[in-house]
């Protein structure tokens, strides 16, 4: 990869890797965990987190998905913040990572 990743965001998005490049512009978008130097344990934890998010959607009829209790969303967001901290730690200071909470 000729351009170096400068900024990432961790966010829950349906059927995604959960990690998105924010900078530089030519690389913006979802990125595979395989392209990052992260542990298999962290990668698996992020995928489990995304799987939980995916489970909230009624895939046959998305408009009739059940509402998720605020307490559950708060717990999910705390877990996302912890995953973001671990991701930042594993990637080091050369890549900035931010978390976008689920609403």
Where are these regions (language model features)?
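Intrinsic low-complexity, intrinsically disordered or marginally ordered coil/linker segments
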Residues: 1-103
């Amino acid at each position: 990869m000729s351009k170096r990743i400068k900024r990432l965001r961790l966010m829950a998005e349906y059927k995604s890797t959960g990690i998105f490049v924010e900078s530089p512009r030519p690389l913006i978008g979802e990125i595979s965990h395989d392209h990052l130097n992260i542990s298999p344990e962290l990668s698996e934890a992020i995928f489990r987190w995304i799987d939980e998010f995916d489970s909230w959607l009624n895939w046959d009829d998305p408009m009739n998905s059940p509402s998720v209790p605020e307490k559950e969303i708060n717990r999910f967001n705390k877990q996302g913040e912890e995953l973001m901290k671990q991701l930042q730690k594993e990637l080091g200071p050369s890549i900035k990572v931010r978390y976008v909470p689920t609403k």
